[in-house]
Amino acid sequence: MSIVNSIRAQIPPIHREGYPFIGGFALISLLLFWLWTPLGWIGVVLTIWCALFFRDPVRVTPVRDDLVVAPADGRVSMVVSMVPPAELGLGDKPLLRISIFMSVFNCHVNRAPVAGRVERIVYSPGKFINADLDKASEDNERNSMVISTPGGQIGVIQIAGLVARRIVSFVRVGQVLGAGERFGLIRFGSRLDVYLPDGAKALVSPGQTSIAGETVLADFRQGDGGRSYRAA
């Protein structure tokens, strides 16, 4: 393998949603260099940050019907029992909810926590308060999705934050997703909530770091089964 290929292998690919932003930052950097060199270097740093924000590395996902993997890179902020939002249609009984907060330094490509069929997608306009606050799940702009699996229905909510002003979804109702498959992203800091079927057991705790498509969040096992892995 050549040196160029070795370097390329170490650099994660960039998601296509980031191309316009990276190009914009690069153009601004050139203009800043023309005005004053130190400002240009600040622009270069911001361009690199933007590229890192939209990075889309390959992830190796554990594949088993009863495992729930992290839908986002970030920090587990809450593991609680909560009544799911009405738009999910999951009833009024409290369910296990695991929340992941993404800072502006995390990779923001979102991945399916389970394999299954998309049963519902509901967009709800709202505010843009700090996504790390509990009330953000009800007050903020969000995109809610329900995935049907053999073990029950999983609710996944993309929640906009203080800086995040754009939720992007790549999927449609009726689409079948694989565990760890990309389904959307949120631009510039946000949160994801995952609502799990009754009886699910959380395998993470608040403060733990999560890696989208790899970190196992919970188990709703119906029986013993082996674990395999799939790169995505």
Curated annotation (Swiss-Prot):
One GO process term, biological-process aspect: phosphatidylethanolamine biosynthetic process
Main location: membrane
GO CC list: plasma membrane
Gene Ontology MF terms in the entry: phosphatidylserine decarboxylase activity
Pathway(s) the chain acts in: Phospholipid metabolism; phosphatidylethanolamine biosynthesis; phosphatidylethanolamine from CDP-diacylglycerol: step 2/2
Enzyme class: lyase
Pfam families registered for this protein in UniProt: PS_Dcarbxylase (PF02666)
Site (Cleavage (non-hydrolytic)): G189, S190
Subcellular localization, as worded in the UniProt entry: Cell membrane
Active site as annotated: S190
Cofactor comment text: Binds 1 pyruvoyl group covalently per subunit.
Post-translational modification: Is synthesized initially as an inactive proenzyme. Formation of the active enzyme involves a self-maturation process in which the active site pyruvoyl group is generated from an internal serine residue via an autocatalytic post-translational modification. Two non-identical subunits are generated from the proenzyme in this reaction, and the pyruvate is formed at the N-terminus of the alpha chain, which is derived from the carboxyl end of the proenzyme.
Keywords from the UniProt entry: Cell membrane, Decarboxylase, Lipid biosynthesis, Lipid metabolism, Lyase, Membrane, Phospholipid biosynthesis, Phospholipid metabolism, Pyruvate, Zymogen
Family: Belongs to the phosphatidylserine decarboxylase family. PSD-A subfamily.
Known function: Catalyzes the formation of phosphatidylethanolamine (PtdEtn) from phosphatidylserine (PtdSer).
Record-given protein name: Phosphatidylserine decarboxylase proenzyme
Lineage: Bacteria, Pseudomonadati, Pseudomonadota, Alphaproteobacteria, Hyphomicrobiales
